[in-house]
């Protein structure tokens, strides 16, 4: 800002001619005086700027919240080039205003606010750190004991998880047992799982039938429900019955199952799936009708053109040539191109 103003005044001749020694008039300030007033923040000017303008020098820098703050232009000078010397205040009044402005801020370093919140990292006490190390060492020793006991008795990690489900009603996966033995679980989860595994170790030592229970549970878990396959003849019969009665009662389901030689659950599930399929089909059909009612994105309509010979991806039309559907842009009446028969389309002819 100062450099811009100085450059503007550098090309304006001082009133009265000469080099400006004739004096200053209202509305104009000597650029040399203006430049002398602009010094380093908080420091003295290059020349007699403050003395010439009749103001007290800028007070020194003061500390503010751990940093250095400097005073800016004081005593409400505004744009100095637009203010004449006659309108400047005396030195006493200017100094008083500077003092009044500086009284609002303390020259001492600012103290901490009483309501200031300090975020400090909470470090555990030596006792807590010792307890944590002792707990981690105990978990490490128990994990080694569990792995040794499991291998000695011939249990797999999956067997341990299934046995916990038989004993306590909650099955744990093989991955969980593996991570516990490898100390890869969080400390919270390790502490939750440790009592259950301790009871498993006791049961494994005292109960000889635990291995048989584990094997039976493994067979139950391994038994998967096979996918039911229905013959085409039976499927057509079910489809015919569905058209007559989409939602049969329990007695009707039992009668249909006995008639077709199927289980009642199979018939019930088939009718339920068939109703859901019908709902999806009706929704798709309604969406298709709405799409056709609103019209295609291209107003010209669909036109089929034969594709050139060669391999094409798609389903052939039972020996008929492949066609592709294109949308033509409608032309105004009287401006359409004459129709060209399909047989006339072929390779371009070159004239000599």
Swiss-Prot record:
Outcome (variant: residue 347 to A): Absence of phosphorylation. Reduced protein degradation. Reduced self-renewal ability in ES cells. No change in FBXW4 binding. Loss of FBXW8 binding
Source organism: Mus musculus (Mouse)
Region of interest (DNA-binding), ranges: 173-179, 186-189
Coiled-coil regions, chain positions: none
Modified residues (Phosphoserine): 106, 229, 282, 347
Name used for this protein in its record: POU domain, class 5, transcription factor 1
PROSITE patterns: HOMEOBOX_1, HOMEOBOX_2, POU_1, POU_2, POU_3
Residue(s) carrying Phosphothreonine: 228
């Amino acid at each position: 800002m100062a450099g811009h103003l100085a450059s503007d005044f550098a090309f304006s001749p001082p009133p009265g001619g000469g080099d400006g020694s004739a004096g200053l008039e209202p509305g104009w300030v000597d650029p040399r005086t203006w430049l002398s007033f602009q010094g380093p923040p908080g420091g003295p000017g290059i020349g007699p700027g403050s003395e010439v303008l009749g103001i007290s020098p800028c007070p020194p820098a003061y500390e503010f919240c751990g940093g250095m703050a400097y005073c800016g232009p004081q005593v409400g000078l505004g744009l100095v080039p637009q203010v004449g010397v006659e309108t400047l205040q005396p030195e006493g009044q200017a100094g008083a205003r500077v003092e009044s402005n500086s009284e609002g801020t303390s020259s001492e370093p600012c103290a901490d606010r009483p309501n200031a919140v300090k975020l400090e990292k909470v470090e555990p006490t030596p006792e807590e750190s010792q307890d944590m190390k002792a707990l981690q060492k105990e978990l490490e020793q128990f994990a080694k004991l569990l792995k040794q006991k499991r291998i000695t008795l011939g249990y797999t990690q999956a067997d341990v998880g299934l046995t916990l489900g038989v004993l306590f009603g909650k099955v744990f996966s093989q991955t969980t047992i593996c991570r516990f033995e490898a100390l890869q679980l969080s400390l919270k989860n390790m502490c939750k799982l440790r009592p259950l595994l301790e009871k498993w170790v006791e049961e494994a030592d005292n109960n000889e039938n635990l291995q048989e229970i584990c094997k039976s549970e493994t067979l139950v878990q391994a038994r998967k429900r096979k996918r039911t396959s229905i013959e085409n003849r039976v499927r057509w019969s079910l489809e015919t019955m569905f058209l007559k009665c989409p939602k049969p009662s329990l007695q009707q389901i039992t009668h249909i199952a006995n008639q077709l030689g199927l289980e009642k659950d199979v018939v019930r599930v088939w009718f339920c799936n068939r109703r859901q399929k019908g709902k999806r089909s009706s929704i798709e059909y309604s969406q298709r009708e709405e799409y056709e009612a609103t019209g295609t994105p291209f107003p010209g309509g669909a036109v089929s053109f034969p594709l050139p010979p060669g391999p094409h991806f798609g389903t052939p039309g039972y020996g008929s040539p492949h066609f592709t559907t294109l949308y033509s842009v409608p032309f105004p009446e009287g401006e359409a191109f004459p129709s060209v028969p399909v047989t006339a389309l072929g390779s371009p002819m070159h004239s000599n």
